[in-house]
Amino acid sequence: VVLVIDCKAMGESAAAIAKGFRDYDPEVNFGGVILNRLGSANHERMVREGMDKIGVPVIGAIYRDDRMHSPERHLGLTPVTEIDPTEAINTIREAVEKMVNLDALLEIATGAPTIELPDAIDVKSIEKRVKIGVAYDEAFSFYYPASLAALEEKGAELVYFSPLNDSVIPDVDGLVFGGGFPEMFLFQLSSNESMKESIRQANAQGMPIYAECGGLMYLCESIHDFEGSVYKTVGIVPANCVMQQKLQKVGYVTATAKRDTLLGAMNTAIRGHEFHFSTMEPTIDDFPWAFHLEGGRKPQSYDGGYATKNVLASYLHLNFAGSDEGAQHFVDTCATYKAQK
């Protein structure tokens, strides 16, 4: 193990952190540290002196450089689809080449035991039973690659489309709307009437539609932005989404289905992550809540999400790679829909 320590505003106290990690579990092969975000040569000297006292090798020392910085906004890092990371990547590469002892790093790496991995599944060899449309553009880009691969392993051919730029959904048997930043593209999304209408028609025909977080927001009747302006969205979820100034939910939760959903039968429990600034406000009294959720950074218990026979939309970010039954059930439901078209 090589520990990377953020040394900003630290001197020899960085050595206490290194010592704690090194001594906490004697079975871990602790190879050394890389000092990150140093402010000057004098700063580096002070931190190195602390490491020398406890006998921890310093593999490298990286200085602070704003060119390495990734821009952020209310939900964390700005997606790579909106920025050109070339300068940051080149700056990091040059710093590592100059300031990290790569020979020592490789020697540590080659001394590690071999990691046994299962044979990768060749998704191209799997018979494709259904086509699933995946919304992917600047507004919807929060996907775990392994999660999408899990759908392919169950026999789905993924067809990517853009709710921002395309006029209609593709010819598919199911739809997936991932998370993202729809609130940053509200004018474009709300103005694309033909796209919204094609989604409404697909819903009316019973097409399975699965949505997470930003996808949920887009499927609601409207989104209220940070300034209070209202933008009409798809409208298949009877609720409005309202952006709030403070973070509403963050953390891993267990979601237990309150009814049958696209991911499984009632009482099926799944694990996922929530992180959102908006609230969903139902516009009907008898709202079909999808899940009862428990957990989060500040543990809570509450109902969330929307579920009908063919729609499941919630703030939950799910990795299908860790929910094999959910992936299977969704693809099977798409196959049933295809057979009945």
Where in the sequence are the language-model features?
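Short, solvent-exposed amphipathic alpha-helical segments in soluble enzyme
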Residues: 18-20, 48-52, 147-153, 191, ...
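Phosphate-binding active sites in nucleotide-utilizing proteins
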Residues: 128-204
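Hydrophobic, well-ordered secondary-structure elements that form the walls
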Residues: 175, 212, 234, 275, ...
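Internal gly/pro-rich beta-alpha loop/helix module
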Residues: 11-124
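Inter-motif core of Ras-like GTPase G domains
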Residues: 1-8
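Cysteine-nucleophile active-site neighborhood
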Residues: 158, 182-262
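Solvent-exposed alpha-helices and their adjacent loops that cap or buttress functional pockets
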Residues: 22-28, 49-54, 124-127, 167-169, ...
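C-terminal and late-domain segments of enzyme folds
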Residues: 126-128, 140-152, 157, 243, ...
